[in-house]
Design a protein with these regions (language model features):
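Surface-exposed interfaces of beta-sheet-rich extracellular modules
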Residues: 58, 137-163
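Conserved "repeat-terminator" motif of extracellular CCP/Sushi domains
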Residues: 164-184
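Extracellular modular ligand-binding repeats in secreted and cell-surface proteins
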Residues: 111-113, 117-148, 172
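Middle-to-C-terminal accessory/interaction subdomains
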Residues: 1-103
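Intrinsic-disorder/low-complexity, polar/charged segments enriched in Ser/Thr/Lys/Arg/Asp/Glu/Gln
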Residues: 99-101, 137-139, 175-177
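A short, amphipathic beta-strand motif
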Residues: 100-116, 180
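Hydrophobic residues in beta-strands and at strand termini
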Residues: 104-106, 144, 172, 182
Length: 184
């Protein structure tokens, strides 16, 4: 079965649209659910769920809370240290030339949101930073909240004057900040 999956994945990745989606989605997941604060919060939540049973487990199978807590800390550290390596594997595997950091912001605060690739960072996270791969197109869309309308994007290193298109299709080459301005 594994050999068939390898063939299927290999063929899918030959399709440039699928390849780009795969790479962008991978970046989106690293930029969101695999970030250290979320992993720690999820791990702590799960730890709190099982905490009442840990002493009983240790009585039966040996161990202690110090070892348990050290194991959790090691898991969190492994995740945090894994992120740069995971990005480098994608960059190497697909022969990409580098990574860029995009900063997204909304003005005025609370007037809208920004959708990037397959995610929409929470309003409480603005300004938001995410790492994407050079040469792989990324779609960025400004979305107005009720009572507001999109006005423009602030100039940045990728375009010199205000950009009035709500949707941007960017092929990353350099770090850039994207600030969506809304009126309302």
């Amino acid at each position: 079965p594994s050999i068939h999956m390898d063939v299927i994945c290999s063929k899918l990745l030959q399709n440039i649209q699928f390849r780009n989606y795969f790479i962008d989605r991978y970046a989106d997941l690293i930029n969101t659910i695999w970030q250290q604060p979320r992993v720690v919060a999820t791990g702590n939540s799960m730890t709190n769920e099982v905490a009442p049973w840990i002493p009983r487990h240790h009585t039966r199978w040996s161990g202690d809370m110090t070892t348990f807590n050290n194991t959790m800390t090691n898991m969190f550290n492994w995740n945090n240290n894994r992120i740069p390596g995971a990005r480098n594997v994608v960059q190497s595997q697909f022969a990409l030339t580098g990574q860029v950091t995009y900063t997204l912001d909304v003005q005025p605060a609370g007037a809208g949101r920004i959708h990037i690739s397959t995610i929409e960072p929470s309003e409480v996270e603005y300004p938001w930073n995410g790492v994407y791969f050079k040469g792989v197109p990324v779609r960025i869309t400004a979305v107005a909240n009720p009572g507001y309308t999109f006005d423009h994007w602030s100039p940045n290193s990728l375009f010199a004057s205000n950009n009035y298109s709500q949707d941007l299709n960017i092929t990353p080459t350099v770090n850039a900040a994207f600030t969506a301005w809304f009126e309302g």
